[in-house]
Structures are given as structure tokens and as C-alpha cells.
């Protein structure tokens, strides 16, 4: 708030964009920097044009994923569930995806290989694991 009320005539903002694997923790304690993770929909008004910068970064990520869909799989664990992949799509595109249609879409992706292994120790029905096959992806995408 204080930054928004100041009478600064020029501000230069440098923004860095980084995508982080879902299952990885950051190496430093965010509390040391008074920083914390916030869901996109929960971001409040930021100083200067920082909300616009975040919106433009999200547009860039969406365009990048459209051109290079394999980038999504770099953000997932080596073996992942359909639910994890669907959640990632929903986060990036900001809207819910129909579960049945998404499973059909996965079935058509030759490079998303179903594994025999299923989740263990979960309270719900165990989900099948999948893996991304980069070789098949490269062959299919040519």
C-alpha cells in the first residue's frame, strides 16, 4: 500500500518467470523474505503495474504450452496421475476441465503412457500412474 501511495515518478520493474515442479519445495525458506505462495485467483491489488505483469506472464505461459505441450510434463513428477495432469491444465487455463473428456484426451495422447502401478495408501479409489515418453512425443510431433 505504501508503495502505491508514494510519489515516485519512475519505476522500473524487472520480472522473472519460472515454472516450478509440483512436487519440489523451494530450497530457501520463503518466510525469510516475507514471501509466500498465493493462488492466482487470490492475488490482491499489487503496487504499480505488477498485477498486469502477472496477467501477461500467464498469457505467455499459456502460449508457450500451446506451442510446446511437453513443457507441462516437466512440471509433473516422473510418474503422475491423470488428476495431477488435469489439475495442472486447470491451473494454467484458469477453468475446470470435464474429467471424462480429459481421460479421453489422455487416451489419445500416445506419449502419455499408462503404467501398471497405482497409487497406494489413499482413502479413495487408487488412481493409475502415467509417464511421459519424450521419444514418442518427438516422433508424433514431427
Task: Describe the predicted segments one by one.
Residues 1-11:
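Acidic pyrophosphate-coordinating catalytic loop
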Residues 3-5, 24-26, 68-76:
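Short helix-to-loop capping/linker segments positioned immediately adjacent to catalytic or ligand/cofactor-binding
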Residues 11-22, 26-63, 75-83, 102-110:
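NUDIX/MutT-family hydrolases
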Amino acid at each position: 500500500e505504501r508503495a502505491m501511495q508514494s510519489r515516485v515518478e519512475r519505476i522500473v520493474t524487472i520480472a522473472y518467470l519460472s515454472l516450478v515442479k509440483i512436487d519440489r519445495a523451494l530450497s530457501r525458506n520463503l518466510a525469510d523474505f516475507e514471501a509466500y505462495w498465493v493462488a492466482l485467483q487470490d492475488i490482491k491489488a499489487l503496487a504499480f503495474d505488477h498485477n498486469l505483469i502477472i496477467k501477461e506472464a500467464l498469457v505467455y505461459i499459456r502460449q508457450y504450452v500451446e506451442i510446446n505441450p511437453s513443457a507441462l510434463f516437466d512440471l509433473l513428477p516422473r510418474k503422475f496421475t491423470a488428476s495431477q495432469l488435469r489439475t495442472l491444465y486447470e491451473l494454467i487455463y484458469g477453468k475446470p476441465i470435464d474429467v471424462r473428456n480429459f481421460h479421453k484426451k489422455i487416451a489419445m495422447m500416445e506419449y502419455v503412457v499408462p503404467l501398471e502401478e497405482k497409487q497406494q495408501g489413499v482413502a479413495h479409489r487408487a488412481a493409475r500412474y502415467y509417464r511421459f515418453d519424450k521419444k514418442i512425443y518427438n516422433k508424433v510431433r514431427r
